[in-house]
Amino acid sequence: MTQLSSSDVPGMGRRQFMNLLTFGSVTGVALGALYPVANYFIPPKAAGSGGGTSAKDELGNPITASGWLSSHPEGDRSLVQGLKGDPTYLIVEGEDAIGSYGINAICTHLGCVVPWNSGANKFMCPCHGSQYDSTGKVVRGPAPLSLALANVSVENDNVFVSQWTETDFRTGDKPWWA
């Protein structure tokens, strides 16, 4: 076998170089644009030993039980970011107790966020008038189902929200959202 000298080896042409440069640039931009899309489909990491996600306030800061209880009176239902970032109501059951369940605030009719009406002691959807009692059970349509529930636990003063898989205590049925 004979070896070619450096003058006999064909160099990379300008066209081939520009094609490689363009391909590399387009590939880099495409991967950079697809990263957030792919990351959206990856569920958040579990926090706490209960396997839930940390409840967060409107700014995305983790909620502590002591801080929440000091600023929310008994019977209060206020929104936090729960599972999958869905708005979820935390319920204050006493001076020093957060309820063991949270209520997903997404209406089962068309997906509107349902506000708590403390004067009427129920959740009232502003979109089409669906109403839910204080536990999230549907009492007036057009919503076909009760609001979804989530387990709420407190570990080392941190509040965690996890998937509700037990029987729905409001209806006695298997949860429709699980």
From Swiss-Prot:
Disulfide bonds join C112-C127. It catalyses: 2 oxidized [plastocyanin] + a plastoquinol + 2 H(+)(in) = 2 reduced [plastocyanin] + a plastoquinone + 4 H(+)(out). It comes from the Bacteria. The keyword Repeat does not apply. Pfam families: Rieske, TM_PetC. GO terms for molecular function: 2 iron, 2 sulfur cluster binding; electron transporter, transferring electrons within cytochrome b6/f complex of photosystem II activity; metal ion binding; monooxygenase activity; oxidoreductase activity, acting on paired donors, with incorporation or reduction of molecular oxygen; plastoquinol--plastocyanin reductase activity. GO terms for biological process: photosynthesis. Its EC number is 7.1.1.6. Residues 65-161 form the Rieske domain. It is a single-pass membrane protein. GO terms for cellular component: plasma membrane-derived thylakoid membrane. PROSITE patterns: RIESKE, TAT. The keyword RNA-binding does not apply. It is an enzyme of class 7 (translocase). Keywords: 2Fe-2S, Disulfide bond, Electron transport, Iron, Iron-sulfur, Membrane, Metal-binding, Thylakoid, Translocase, Transmembrane, Transmembrane helix, Transport. Its cofactor is [2Fe-2S] cluster. Belongs to the Rieske iron-sulfur protein family. Component of the cytochrome b6-f complex, which mediates electron transfer between photosystem II (PSII) and photosystem I (PSI), cyclic electron flow around PSI, and state transitions. The Rieske iron-sulfur protein is a high potential 2Fe-2S protein. This is Cytochrome b6-f complex iron-sulfur subunit. It comes from Synechococcus sp. (strain CC9605).
